[in-house]
UniProtKB/Swiss-Prot annotation:
<keyword id="KW-0862">Zinc</keyword>
<comment type="subunit">
    <text>Part of the 50S ribosomal subunit.</text>
</comment>
<dbReference type="Pfam" id="PF01197">
    <property type="entry name" value="Ribosomal_L31"/>
</dbReference>
<comment type="similarity">
    <text>Belongs to the bacterial ribosomal protein bL31 family. Type A subfamily.</text>
</comment>
<keyword id="KW-0687">Ribonucleoprotein</keyword>
<feature type="binding site">
    <location>
        <position position="16"/>
    </location>
    <ligand>
        <name>Zn(2+)</name>
    </ligand>
</feature>
<feature type="binding site">
    <location>
        <position position="37"/>
    </location>
    <ligand>
        <name>Zn(2+)</name>
    </ligand>
</feature>
<dbReference type="GO" id="GO:0003735">
    <property type="term" value="F:structural constituent of ribosome"/>
</dbReference>
<keyword id="KW-0689">Ribosomal protein</keyword>
<dbReference type="GO" id="GO:0019843">
    <property type="term" value="F:rRNA binding"/>
</dbReference>
<keyword id="KW-0479">Metal-binding</keyword>
<dbReference type="InterPro" id="IPR027491">
    <property type="entry name" value="Ribosomal_bL31_A"/>
</dbReference>
<dbReference type="GO" id="GO:0005840">
    <property type="term" value="C:ribosome"/>
</dbReference>
<dbReference type="InterPro" id="IPR034704">
    <property type="entry name" value="Ribosomal_bL28/bL31-like_sf"/>
</dbReference>
<keyword id="KW-0694">RNA-binding</keyword>
<keyword id="KW-0699">rRNA-binding</keyword>
<dbReference type="InterPro" id="IPR042105">
    <property type="entry name" value="Ribosomal_bL31_sf"/>
</dbReference>
Length: 70
């Protein structure tokens, strides 16, 4: 490999909203904030949970909710 052309590879922490902290190696260089990780994702935990980012479900129901009602 050629010296001096590859990005820096450092250890960063990825913090999830559930409190899980994951240490990974990355070229990003700064810590990450995750909404969902493997410890709290509904597919892996077997529980149903609605993940609503920014009220998108409410916004959709407000716009198109009347179409389904007769």
């Amino acid at each position: 490999m050629k010296p001096g052309i590859h990005p820096e590879y450092a250890e960063i922490t990825a913090n999830c909203t559930c409190g899980n902290v994951i240490k990974v190696n990355s070229t990003v260089g700064k810590d990450l904030h995750l909404d969902v990780c493997g410890a709290c994702h509904p597919f892996y935990t077997g529980t149903q949970k609605v993940v609503d980012t920014g009220g998108r479900i409410d916004k959709f129901n407000k716009r198109f909710g009347m179409l389904g009602k007769k």
